Regions:
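Boundary regions of SH3-family modules and the immediately adjacent low-complexity/disordered segments
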Residues: 62-74, 124-150, 197-252
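SH3/SH3-like (including bacterial SH3b) beta-barrel domains
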Residues: 89-101, 161-174
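SH3/SH3-like beta-barrel superfamily modules
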Residues: 100-134, 173-208
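Active-site-adjacent "subsite" loops/lids of carbohydrate-active enzymes
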Residues: 255-274, 331, 345-397
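Catalytic domains of carbohydrate-active enzymes, especially glycoside hydrolases
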Residues: 279-304, 401-406, 488, 563-571
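Aromatic-lined carbohydrate-binding/catalytic grooves of carbohydrate-active enzymes
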Residues: 289-324, 416-423, 584, 591
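Aromatic-lined carbohydrate-recognition surfaces of secreted/lumenal glycan-active proteins
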Residues: 342-352, 408-411, 437-474, 529-543, ...
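Substrate-binding cleft of secreted/luminal carbohydrate-active enzymes
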Residues: 486-500, 509-515, 520-595
């Protein structure tokens, strides 16, 4: 088949019209050459001027590009990241500093710097000025502030099923992977509470107890040689080893609306109605000296301060034997507070015969399963979380109902004198999680401190004088571990509690005895990265051992001076179990001379 050739058509009307227009254009350019050139130059100048004003000079792909208008648009947002801090930069993208994630900020959407495909927005911080922040670290959704999807347990803790509850769930061990569902608040970039999931259980855990990688969670904390100090202190007496306890630094509480006296000088009151009935006399005495605080019993073993509804739930026997009504006790505490004094509520923790009567299943038991009477009491096991919940619930009620500034846990230990039972295997501690005694005590204090800080109060822990030694005691108290957690640690180095050495009686030499003890306690304070305030119980009663020497103003002043000279400057609490007003008058010169 032959292809047909296209016929050439010429001289059509449209082609003639185009030729005529082209001829006219050539004639115009010949006649107006200079005018056209001038117009072109003007157009080029205008374009260049616009580039200069707008700062839009062309850059290579590797150079920083800045975009800015005279009227930038502002958006509110939050700093987000997987880390606790985020860098911010100057216009050249040189780092200027860091800000904490979770911070609410304002950023300009039209004032940006772009580099390597990432946009940085000019961001304004509430207190730290401004700087450029990566788009990857800005969000408008508060639930996207934390970027991590999993966290790993660094310090073993019991999950809290509800964020606002003191009730405890399962224990999660070190290294356990937790799925992050949400979070509640941040403080300096650290998450206050993670909402997590673990083996089908949902709960909350503080951000201070987790890490974002398995390596960080299992890392041994040894800054400043902390780990090395404790690693060699093994389980010598049955209380556990020092190495397995937690020494990560903790931020100590400092409540602006609840200032703690510094130093704190306190006298002690029982919850006996006869004592509390004389409250005006004690207040008058304190006002006439340098005393600035009171310690008042919430409960002391079987001496119950008031009929708290918490007892109705956990220990009806304690409720039945309360010394005062809520209103009577409340009136006393309010009078102390109205007089301007700091009030500490003392609460015995794991020494509680009434609770063991009501709940023998949680009592330390003998081999046959019966509650064991040891050291003049029945003892709820410090391993049992239900006991923890009971004591913290009681502390919360005392804070909310009575207005205490601080909760002091006494008998925060296992009973002493159980060594023979343990050797013979004739004792049951109900140790559900296979913890050491020292681990249980420290973990209880972590739990209690975390909860009570939410109520704006401080937490103190009383410890035996023996804990100034460089070992874990048989009853689970180890000074550095407790000091690292509590806000206040209070040794009880009463001179008449020290053993006689030949003819030397320590209680006849209060200054020397207290110097030796305080020197050792100060060493223990230096062995923890975030030590508590050391506020010591002092002997303010006559010696209970021969020759029953009197403790007057000079002896008490010597105790106070010895503590201060050794660096234990947090103050003192004067122990006199009878709360004798007569003895207080004898001691007046010592308390008037306080600085």
């Amino acid at each position: 088949m032959k292809l047909r050739k296209r016929k050439r058509i010429s001289g059509t009307p449209k082609r003639k019209q185009r030729a005529q227009r082209l001829a006219l254009l050539k004639q115009f350019l010949r006649e107006h050459t200079w005018g056209v050139m001038i117009a072109g130059l003007i157009l080029i100048a205008v374009v260049l001027f616009i580039f200069v004003i707008a700062g839009a000079s062309p850059k290579t792909a590797d150079e920083t590009q800045t975009a800015q208008t005279d009227t930038p648009r502002y958006e509110s947002g939050y700093i987000c990241a997987i880390t606790t801090e985020v860098p911010y930069y100057d216009e050249d993208l040189s780092q200027s500093g860091t800000v904490a994630r979770g911070m609410e900020v304002t950023y300009a959407t039209d004032k940006t710097v772009r580099q390597d495909g990432v946009t940085y927005y000019m961001t304004y911080f509430p207190t730290l000025g401004h700087g450029y922040v990566s788009e990857e670290n800005l969000t408008q959704n508060v639930h996207e502030v934390i970027a991590e999807k999993t966290v790993y347990v660094r310090t073993p803790q019991n999950l809290r099923p509800e964020k606002d509850s003191y009730v405890l769930g399962s224990l999660v061990e070190q290294g356990t992977e937790l799925q992050v569902l949400d979070y509640e608040g941040t403080t300096n970039g650290v998450v206050d509470l993670y909402k997590v999931s673990y083996q089908g259980e949902t709960g909350y855990i503080s951000g201070q107890y987790v890490a974002t990688t398995p390596e960080a969670a299992n890392e041994v904390y040894d800054r400043f040689g902390v780990y090395a100090i404790h690693a060699g202190r093994g389980d010598k007496w049955g209380g556990g080893d020092a190495e397995s306890l937690d020494y990560y630094p903790r931020t100590k509480a400092d409540f602006a609306d609840n200032p703690m006296p510094d130093p704190c000088y306190a006298i002690y009151l029982t919850c006996d109605p006869a004592v509390l009935g004389d409250i005006d006399k004690y207040i008058e005495y304190a006002k006439s000296t340098k005393i600035n605080a009171f310690v008042v019993n919430i409960m002391d073993g079987t001496s119950i301060g008031y009929n708290s509804p918490v007892y109705e739930e956990y220990s009806p026997t304690a409720y039945q034997y309360a010394n005062n009504t809520v209103e009577e006790y409340q009136a006393v505490i309010q009078r102390i507070k109205d007089a301007g004094f700091y009030v500490i509520g003392r609460l015995t923790t794991f020494n509680d015969s009434f609770f063991c009567q009501d709940h023998p299943e949680y009592a330390i038991a003998d081999g046959s399963g019966d509650p064991l009477y040891v050291a003049a009491s029945y003892w709820p096991s410090a391993f049992c979380r239900y006991v923890w919940e009971y004591k913290v619930a009681l502390a919360i009620d005392a804070v909310e109902t009575m207005g205490f500034n601080e909760i002091q846990f006494d008998y925060v230990r296992f009973p002493d004198g159980t060594g023979d039972y343990e050797k013979e295997g004739d004792i049951d501690f109900h140790n559900e999680y296979d913890e050491t005694k020292a681990q249980a005590i420290q973990r209880f204090l972590m739990y209690a401190t975390d909860i009570l800080h939410e109520y704006g109060v401080y937490v103190g822990a009383d410890v035996f004088g023996e804990t100034s030694g460089n070992y874990v005691t048989a009853y689970g108290q180890y000074w550095p571990a407790i000091s690292n957690v509590a806000d206040v640690i209070s040794g009880m180095p009463y001179p008449d509690h020290f053993s006689q050495n030949g003819t030397y009686r320590p209680w006849e030499h209060p200054y020397e005895t207290m110097v030796d003890w305080a020197e050792s306690a100060a060493k223990r304070q230096s062995e923890t990265p975030s030590p508590a305030i050391a506020r010591t119980w002092i002997q303010a009663y006559d010696a209970i051992r021969p020759p029953y020497n009197s403790y007057g103003a000079q002896e008490v002043a010597d105790e106070i001076r010895a503590l201060s000279e050794q660096g234990l400057t947090g103050g003192f609490m004067a122990w006199n179990a009878s709360c004798s007003l007569k003895k207080l008058e004898e001691l007046r010169p010592a308390y008037e001379a306080l600085e």
